[in-house]
Regions:
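Beta-strand-centric surfaces of beta-sandwich/beta-rich domains
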Residues: 1-122
C-alpha cells in the first residue's frame, strides 16, 4: 500500500496551520525592565514560538528575558550581535500565568526585537 499520511496533531498539540500566532516587533532602549508583550488576563499565559533580540548599539549589553519578574534567560550581547530562539512544536516557551514577557537591559542601549507568540488558557 502506498500513499501519504497526514499528521495533524501530536497529542493535544495541533500542527501546522491550526495554530495562530501574533507577531510583535519593536525596539527597547531603556535600562532595566522593558515589557515587550503585555501580560494576558488571569487564567491565561503567553506561549513564545520564536524570539529574536538584536543589540543595535555599539555597547555590549547584558540581556535578561523574564516571565513577569522571574529571570529565565541571561546573556551578554556584543555590539550589533543578536540572539535567536525558535522552539519546536510542543516545546514552546510557556510563561507563567498572567505574566508579561519582559526584556531587561543592563544599559540604555537600543535593542530591536521580534517575537511570535500566542495566548493559551492554563
Amino acid at each position: 500500500m502506498s500513499g501519504n499520511v497526514a499528521i495533524r496533531t501530536i497529542g493535544d498539540t495541533v500542527l501546522g496551520k491550526g495554530t495562530v500566532y501574533t507577531q510583535a516587533a519593536s525596539t527597547a532602549a531603556s535600562s532595566g525592565d522593558n515589557t515587550v508583550v503585555a501580560a494576558p488576563s488571569a487564567g491565561n499565559h503567553l506561549v513564545v514560538k520564536d524570539l529574536m533580540v538584536q543589540n543595535e548599539s555599539s555597547t555590549e549589553t547584558t540581556v535578561i528575558l523574564k516571565s513577569g519578574s522571574t529571570a529565565k534567560w541571561r546573556g551578554k550581547l556584543a555590539a550589533n550581535a543578536a540572539l535567536s530562539l525558535s522552539f519546536a512544536v510542543g516545546e514552546e516557551w510557556r510563561l507563567g500565568t498572567a505574566e508579561a514577557l519582559v526584556l531587561n537591559l543592563s544599559g540604555a542601549n537600543s535593542h530591536g526585537y521580534s517575537i511570535r507568540y500566542r495566548t493559551e488558557a492554563d
